[in-house]
Amino acid sequence: MAMQLTDATFEVEVLQSELPVIVDFGAAWCGPCNAIAPFMDQLSEEYAGKAKVFKADIDECKALAMKFRIMNVPTILYFKGGQVVDKHVGMGTKQVFEDKLKKLI
């Protein structure tokens, strides 16, 4: 299951991670965010030990949402070496998200 990220845990969990990281920015009230949540949970389980997958609620992680200029949800950011290396905005299939992740492993 994808772990919940907070403003306080972001630096350690994402920026300092030696593994590639997906951060799924969404909100509880967002239908498309809820629709892709199972995909993120599946990727978290399938790539355990190879990548990390986090969820960040924009209503709770306002500083992060502002820092990365999250204007629409869902927005998925892909990090490697503490840097954003790819981005996806809107709905997508599990395959779309997985293909982007595979490029980072």
Segment roles from a protein language model:
Residues F25-F39:
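Conserved redox-active cysteine motifs that mediate thiol-disulfide chemistry
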Residues L64-V73, L77-F79, M91:
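Structural alpha/beta surface segment adjacent to cysteine/selenocysteine redox centers
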Residues M1, T6, G26, F54:
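Conserved Rossmann-like nucleotide-binding pocket used by diverse enzymes
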Residues E18-P20, A37-A56:
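Conserved helix-turn-beta segment immediately C-terminal to the redox Cys motif
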Residues Y78-I105:
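Non-catalytic, surface beta->alpha helical segment in thiol-disulfide oxidoreductase systems
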Residues M3-V21:
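A short beta-strand-turn-helix
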Residues E18-L19, F25-W29, N72:
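Short pre-active-site segment immediately N-terminal to redox-active cysteine/selenocysteine motifs
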Residues I58-L64:
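Structural microenvironment flanking redox-active thiols in thiol-disulfide oxidoreductases
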